[in-house]
């Protein structure tokens, strides 16, 4: 930041500190304990829409909010007051305010208000309603009270925060000047409530599981590691809620879910944040086909509640979330896109050579045809799946917690839901055979010992739970942040997380 700008900001802050001191000496704040509002700005706008131009309504109202703009013209002034619900104009008339001040009914005079209260300050006012000759509903102020003095200027109301990263670092400023950002987080809150309500209405029970875990499992991801001092024990922030929710199914809860935070020590992008929110759902006596139906019903219902329809627009593209959605197997989609039939490949070298021949990158760490199939899908297919598509039947090598397919050797009963080229949900017919599960986790542990930091370890307590007996179960995980991105037309996950993790700011 240029030195001249820093100097100007420092001078402005000093001026505002002087005003704060002046208000304090007048007995008016500058930091109040409380204020009793009779209405929100939205209530006033809605309830008095019939007030004609030039008319007053002798109804005393009290309203509080932040001063967004101010215009002082001699003995008149006009302020714009904003609260969470909207804005309203304050009509400030010297004679009216000074008359109230002389009767000791108010906290200050017109001159004190117009010289000591700046844009950014929080104030509470009491007055009557009038509609100006220009048609603007206004509160004709009689009394005013400073509630909190702002020592920093607001961003320019016309240009907002031009620096996108500053919007994320100082979200409070972004929310002040951007109605779109406020609407995004309002929709997020409504969406989370709607998801919980939908599940609760269908007899699913939300039960919290540990965030700190002795063994990180339930996903192929690197965990964050911490340490418990009293127990002298390494612990991990959870990378999924899956294994503990399955324990609850073993214990007799037939419909269970948890909506909460997940932590993965991985890269950041427009689609990834190390701390994110998911909902995992488990239903006894169900399989992955049942979970497809549940996913369609849940997402389409919530979309209708939040967006008003199952047809929405995302980044200029119309998306139709009306069920039923397309279903296609991974190997069929790859074959359509590349001409390669991975189900016919029995040899890793042959599959790798075929991938290279059609221009696909062959990762050096791939050690099976199944992993190459998944790699080909990610490179050649994933971004093309714009309309909601269930991608079915994944390779067993990349799905250690999913049940083997009932009729397709080498595959598991798993789907991922893709919308606008992004994975939005993941589900299995859950693996409930404890012996099969042990073999797969031991294979994962061998991969981890060989250097794969995303591979699972062996969770002996989870295996013990499976040996007690788990009923046939369908499991589902939905990424809340990506769903919010879709429902709010947001291009980056940072737009829908109030305080995303960012790189340290460079000091100049």
UniProtKB/Swiss-Prot annotation:
The keyword Cytoplasm applies. Homodimer. Binds 3 Mg(2+) ions per subunit. The keyword Lyase does not apply. This is Lysine--tRNA ligase. One of its GO terms (molecular function) is ATP binding. GO terms for cellular component: cytosol. Keywords: Aminoacyl-tRNA synthetase, ATP-binding, Cytoplasm, Ligase, Magnesium, Metal-binding, Nucleotide-binding, Protein biosynthesis. Its cofactor is Mg(2+).
